[in-house]
From Swiss-Prot:
It is an enzyme of class 4 (lyase). Rapid and exclusive production of ethanol as the end product of sugar fermentation by the bacterium Zymononas mobilis is due to the presence of pyruvate decarboxylase. The gene is pdc. One of its GO terms (biological process) is aromatic amino acid family catabolic process to alcohol via Ehrlich pathway. Homotetramer. Binds 1 Mg(2+) per subunit. This is Pyruvate decarboxylase.
Amino acid sequence: MSYTVGTYLAERLVQIGLKHHFAVAGDYNLVLLDNLLLNKNMEQVYCCNELNCGFSAEGYARAKGAAAAVVTYSVGALSAFDAIGGAYAENLPVILISGAPNNNDHAAGHVLHHALGKTDYHYQLEMAKNITAAAEAIYTPEEAPAKIDHVIKTALREKKPVYLEIACNIASMPCAAPGPASALFNDEASDEASLNAAVEETLKFIANRDKVAVLVGSKLRAAGAEEAAVKFADALGGAVATMAAAKSFFPEENPHYIGTSWGEVSYPGVEKTMKEADAVIALAPVFNDYSTTGWTDIPDPKKLVLAEPRSVVVNGIRFPSVHLKDYLTRLAQKVSKKTGALDFFKSLNAGELKKAAPADPSAPLVNAEIARQVEALLTPNTTVIAETGDSWFNAQRMKLPNGARVEYEMQWGHIGWSVPAAFGYAVGAPERRNILMVGDGSFQLTAQEVAQMVRLKLPVIIFLINNYGYTIEVMIHDGPYNNIKNWDYAGLMEVFNGNGGYDSGAGKGLKAKTGGELAEAIKVALANTDGPTLIECFIGREDCTEELVKWGKRVAAANSRKPVNKLL
């Protein structure tokens, strides 16, 4: 079988497990899209704009482990770069592929459309290098296989996005055939000496410490170490807490799990348990202003074992080339029981999170009642995509059955991320019950991608909280800029359905102003398997979780610190 640059790329994407790639057409990528379509083992999924295309791919990567997005040059790629920055921050291997001008024009110094009006066309590649783990431009078919393999292998190894630029007159040119897929997955093993030393130093560090706690961080999935973390926790016997962005990365029904560790907004008893611990073994954590509640919840470095995806720092010694999965597996085989932290937590009798009792069905709808009814929908096969804002805190409060997942974008924190991410996730995992929790302000940024849920008949259940503004910004710093124009959100579903058109959809838009109306709307949503259901939930502007208020004040205080005289 003969290959072109485009079909080579398609085959490599299929070989790494992709069944879909996301795309927005533009004249510099049309021939490439044609070539990708020739591979019948992968479907081309279309998005409404390039920002959404990037976020859709990011959501797909959460479900499938990797993703690809195809856009046009400059006017497309520069929009997608926002989402690629998010994929970098969230440790997700998204392959961004951009069409590019004909290399004859590039060589001749012609001024072209969709560009800056200059004759240097390297600027997009140079920009991409700052937000990806690898970036390559293909100007000849001979160099295509090596460059394609390089970026894909880098994405899979580093769990970071990569960038590939293909000149429009190169996509259909013949090139070499792809070899075995195994070459793309090869990764350097842990250095045995460094691994053994890290394990022995850790055992020595905790030998005389009984109250040992485990803190699960948001890079645990990227490290491929979720199962290893459970085995280690079971062997250790200590308390296990998750950082906010790592919710669902450790099974909440595990007997060692004590809840979310998030400073002042932690689960009851968790903050005190973590502070009283003799040692904290942090697994792939991210300590930023959000995760530390405005820098108020940072572990004591004298008690900390910092286990990153590829290195371990313990007792002031850094052990490189140690894979987290290998480290935890080896520790689980050698560690002695250390139950002190879990015993201490139990002695506090801190109780469970206070949950709202069922509301009067005729009473005006409130935030707590929405969260209660959403939590009742959770099964081991459910994924909740929680938008930046109070949806974070509502999802944090939910008790997850084993197998349920929650997805956040807490490092990048781009409002509007959740809508295309939920679309992409549902494309990648259509067998799951996919729930989207999003506020009205965030929804307005990326609402168009609901139309693609309609197009592909994806039964995503969307809980849209209509409280007339950016609530998370209100809690951090209020002003008139946090007020938004109200929409008829439920009414949008008729727009997206395009009733009467050649591809009329089956999306449903419903409104809920009471708990009873919400319960009835959920029944309709569960019965609608032919498209998304958007439930517009009306609540008061000041109605939010107590946790958001506390957290917002801490983050606001961190933002308002006096300036320093010197930057790093």
